Every structure is written in structure tokens, then in C-alpha cells.
Amino acid sequence: MSATAREIDTPYGLARAHSQLVERPRAGMVLGHGAGGGVTARDLLAATETSHEHGVSVVLVEQPYRVAGRKSPPPAAQLDTAWRAVVESLRGDELSGLRLLVGGRSSGARVACRTVEAVGAAALLCLAFPLVPPARRSGPPPVSRLPELDAVSVPTLVVQGENDRFGIPPAGPRRRVAVVPGDHSLRSGLAGLRTALGEWLGEVV
């Protein structure tokens, strides 16, 4: 396996792609991080290791705002545009000619959902999808992000902690939901994540 990192220019600054490529890959997966976290989140690393075991190369993507040292993400449209630029670059280089899978954790899962068809991905992985923001003491009630998941037409795996404060999405015609121990961090559910992802990869790759 080879591990490299390179910066990729996007309309909103430089992103960073951390590639972990297996020999004779069966597919390539691109994963994004959460809003306030990075590519070293435990669930992303567990997903990477499991993907390698199934012959899938993985690229972990740092959005431009994280590369620039900012903690708060920009508007969704900027995240989506930067993500599309990164995936396009990867498809012309590290993942050229491979069946493409995309995904991420939390905010990164939402970005992958919204852009899955635009980048031509064959399947989608959502770790800790933030379904409904926790209610605030004042202001309007939170809005569900379920329409983002429902708009996806490719096979989808959602891995969600049973105590996730954002809730648990329902399964759908092409959407499998694996509920594992733990909360939004998925730290207590890594074994379940690996099992669910391994089974799913055996079907979609």
C-alpha cells in the first residue's frame, strides 16, 4: 500500500487529499471529515482500514477551510463546490479508471450526499449522518436533513450510533442503516461499523 498527500486547488482555496492506495484496487473511496473535526477521526480511520481489507483504495479529504486553519465551515455551497473539484482531480489521477464510492462523517456525509450524482459515484457511505440538529431553547424548530438522503439514488450505507443526538435516519429502498453502540462520535461502535461496512462493500464493489 502507498500513502501520499497532495494539495488540490479549488475555487475556495487549497484542499488536501491523503491517499492510501492498495495494490490492484477494486474501487476507490473518497471520504470527507466532519464540520469541526479532521481526517483522523476514529470512524474515518476504521472505515479506511476496512476498505483496504476489501481491496478499496481510500482518499481522505481535508476541506480548504481546515487546510487554512479555520475551525468553522463555510456555507454548504462552498463545501460542495470544493468537494467536486477535489473528486474530479482524484478521478483524473489517483483513482483514475476505478469504480468510485464517496462518503464522510457528519457534515462530510451531507456534502457527499448532495454531490453524489454530480461526481458520478456508484455508492455512498454516511457515518453519523446529522439527521436533525438538536433543538434550541428559542427560535424555529430544527429542520430534518432527511431530504438530502432521500434524493440519493445509489446504494447507501448509513452507520449511526444508537444514542446519536441528531437521531437515526430510516432505512429506504436503496439505503441500509446500521445502528451501532454509542453516540455521534461512533467511538463505541467501531466494531459494528467495520462489520456493516465489510458486508456492504462485498455487495457494492
Where are these regions (language model features)?
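Serine-hydrolase catalytic machinery in alpha/beta-hydrolase-like enzymes
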Residues: R6-R99, V111, R145, V179
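Short beta-strand immediately N-terminal to the catalytic nucleophile in serine-hydrolase-like folds
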Residues: R99-G104, L127
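Hydrolases whose catalytic domains are alpha/beta-hydrolase-1, hotdog thioesterase
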Residues: V111-T115, A135
